[in-house]
Design a protein with these regions (language model features):
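Active-site-proximal cofactor/substrate-binding loop regions of enzyme domains
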Residues: 1-10
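Short, acidic, small-residue-rich periplasmic hinge/interaction motif at the N-terminus
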Residues: 12-16
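C-terminal catalytic domain of Rieske-type non-heme iron oxygenases
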Residues: 17-170
Length: 170
């Protein structure tokens, strides 16, 4: 089974267990699409997905970017299971060094990220990050198993600002 959608071929070797996730931003002219990367990772798709939803790692793994080392306690997720997987929502503190001001649209040294995270069966995720400025940064991850020890990660994102506001190559 192969379907062309969102600029990619979506393949299921057997009958698909779920539909391809709906990504409304893809066809909405108010959003710009940025294809970020397509990489092979030496891990399983379930481990990568688990990490995607683990907000306790931000202060440690992302300390050079948005992690706040002085606030290592993870924020509480509100989790809702649904027919396509689950939806999890939280608000976190995020470091916002000057080099990230254009990404967040915020000038403060520490800001917040309202994170709306969704898991779609079997191996996809959507992370909608909203900053206090109203800037939204929606990340799509698709994790494709290759073998028992590796997977292919495809990531692209959507932003509701302009290239002049925040260049895609930042």
């Amino acid at each position: 089974h192969c379907t062309a959608r969102y600029g990619y071929a979506w393949v299921a070797l057997d009958e698909p267990i779920a539909d391809i996730p709906d990504i409304p931003e893809f066809s909405n002219p108010a959003w710009r699409t940025i294809f970020q990367f397509y990489e092979t990772w030496a891990t399983s798709q379930m481990r990568a997905l688990e990490n995607s939803f683990d907000n306790s790692h931000f202060s440690f793994v992302h300390r050079a970017t948005f992690g706040v080392p002085d606030a290592p306690q993870p924020s509480k997720y509100e989790l809702i299971e649904n027919d396509t997987g689950f939806y999890a929502e939280t608000v976190i503190a995020a470091a916002n060094p000057e080099k990230f001001h254009r990404i967040s649209g915020v000038q403060d040294a520490v800001t917040t990220r309202h994170m709306r995270n969704a898991y779609f069966l079997p191996f996809s995720r959507r992370l909608d990050i909203e900053y206090p400025s109203g800037v939204r940064h929606v990340i799509i991850n698709c994790f494709t198993p290759i073998d028992d020890g590796s997977m292919q990660l495809c990531q692209w994102l959507f932003r509701n600002d302009t290239e002049e506001d925040c260049p895609a190559q930042m």
